[in-house]
Amino acid sequence: MKMNKIAICFALIFGTCLAVEAQNTKFIGKNDPDAKKVLDALSAKLNSYKAVQANFMLKVEDSKGKLQGSRSGVIYLKGNKYHISVVGGQEIYCDGKDVYTYDKSSNEVTITKNDPTTQTISPDKLFTNFYDKDYLYKLNGEDKLGARTVEEVELTPVDKTKSFFKVVLYIDKVTHALVSMKVFDKGGNRYTMDTSKINGAATFTDAELAYNKAKFPGAEEVDLRN
């Protein structure tokens, strides 16, 4: 599973996910004001957090719904900085400027720019109203995820050249927390990320979110920032 998909799906970051195809086309081409209320409540909820620690489970299914793989891990998020630790020896660090992705299997670190102008839903973007500029959105109604009543909001990227064509957010109706996220790519794959044990008052230092070369001795660095 490619690690950049984790950043796309999270957003990482905020249960079994039900795949509900949108039937309401009333707001195609314009934004649904009811969906905006739900998204604004989510944004306000996240902005109330000083620092976030949350567990996640990411699974990938093909166009036929067959499971292709799954990963679990923990995300640490503070402002525009984050650290995603994935079971199996993969780590992603973002210092707000650059993103460092370490893959234990290849002992390689890939360095890319953290571009705030992209339509990727990265963890730090969840603290903003990114949806007002980058997406068309509509409210598909309510559903049940376990014992929780969630509101389902569908996002469609304005830029049609993106590798994905739809994102569905499942937001707790009572707490306004992001329970699950599903990303649909143009290749027919579906990426579902479920979150749990969200701590909005987590304590960790900026150093714990920063990439430290000394932690990965002998790792080859591949710099793709240019």
Model-found features: residue ranges?
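An acidic-aromatic
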Residues: V74-T120, Y191-T192
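Extracytoplasmic/secreted envelope proteins and their assembly/folding machinery
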Residues: K36-L39, S43, G96, D124, ...
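N-terminal leader/targeting segments and the immediate start of mature chains
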Residues: L18-L67, N80-K81, K215, E220-N226
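Flexible, surface-exposed loop/linker segments and immediately adjacent secondary-structure boundaries
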Residues: N114-T149
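Bacterial Sec-dependent N-terminal signal peptides
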Residues: M1-T25
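Beta-turn initiation residues at beta-strand->coil junctions
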Residues: L58-V60, V86-V87, K182-D185
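Gly/Pro-enriched, hydrophobic low-complexity segments
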Residues: A22, Y135-N140, K144-R225
